[in-house]
Amino acid sequence: MLYGFSGVILQGALVTLELAISSVVLAVIIGLIGAGGKLSQNRLSGLIFEGYTTLIRGVPDLVLMLLIFYGLQIALNTVTEAMGVGQIDIDPMVAGIITLGFIYGAYFTETFRGAFMAVPKGHIEAATAFGFTRGQVFRRIMFPSMMRYALPGIGNNWQVILKSTALVSLLGLEDVVKATQLAGKSTWEPFYFAIVCGVIYLVFTTVSNGVLLFLERRYSVGVKRADL
């Protein structure tokens, strides 16, 4: 059925998953920092992150990916040359995680900013009145409440990141796209293996939808009843 390429394709699929999960973790971290920066009273912080999100959303992902990848490579080689060290090539997986995380960190910034703004201020004021510290307010009030509003955006961003991992094959990463391309060229069946690649991504997104639906229900427990 896969002409002996099942092992290679499976390995490529695992690489794709690893890339997607690692990238979304980095993007979430950047997004939380960015949302905090845009909501802070510090005007400089707000301007920096506003410029970051505007730049990222205004330039195509592939162009940004190539700029970041080659920019990192040039910067690294400049530093190593100054130190008298030979050229160092950036690992495609590391490059992919950094580029995807940096790009989609901008989208997560807007997702989290909107979610934090949707949390009723009365909840925070009540927690403060009960003597909660700022850390406790964030962990026990703001974060759980924010997640209910953020999950649809998180799910959408995750799906986009998952599909955008296909672009990283251009950087030399041996992911599922690269594996199916290799299989297609070797067997003279490129269309068939393109379908195989599409089916694998469809399975990933379908399973992701189920997980996200579960999380949305989990964070909405008691909310609908209270709204009624």
UniProtKB/Swiss-Prot annotation:
Assembly and partners are described as: The HisPMQJ complex is composed of two ATP-binding proteins (HisP), two transmembrane proteins (HisM and HisQ) and a solute-binding protein (HisJ). The HisPMQ-ArgT complex is composed of two ATP-binding proteins (HisP), two transmembrane proteins (HisM and HisQ) and a solute-binding protein (ArgT).
Stated membrane topology is:
Multi-pass membrane protein
For whether the record's keyword set contains Transmembrane, the answer is yes
Periplasmic compartment: which residues?
1-12, 80-87, 172-194
First and last residue of the signal peptide: none
Q: Which organism is it from?
A: Escherichia coli (strain K12)
Q: Which GO terms describe its molecular function?
A: high-affinity L-histidine transmembrane transporter activity
Chief localization? membrane
- Give TM segment ranges: 13-33, 59-79, 88-108, 149-171, 195-215
| Entry-linked CDD domains | TM_PBP2
Query: Its family?
Result: Belongs to the binding-protein-dependent transport system permease family. HisMQ subfamily.
Compartmental location: Cell inner membrane
Gene that produces this protein = hisQ
Residue numbers on the Cytoplasmic membrane side: 34-58, 109-148, 216-228
One term under GO cellular component: ATP-binding cassette (ABC) transporter complex, substrate-binding subunit-containing
Give the UniProt record's GO annotations in the biological process aspect.
amino acid import across plasma membrane; L-histidine import across plasma membrane; L-histidine transmembrane transport
Q: Name the lineage.
A: Bacteria, Pseudomonadati, Pseudomonadota, Gammaproteobacteria, Enterobacterales
Ranges for domain ABC transmembrane type-1: 13-212
The entry's protein name is: Histidine/lysine/arginine/ornithine transport system permease protein HisQ
Task: Tell me the superkingdom of the source.
Answer: Bacteria
Keyword tags: Amino-acid transport, Cell inner membrane, Cell membrane, Membrane, Transmembrane, Transmembrane helix, Transport
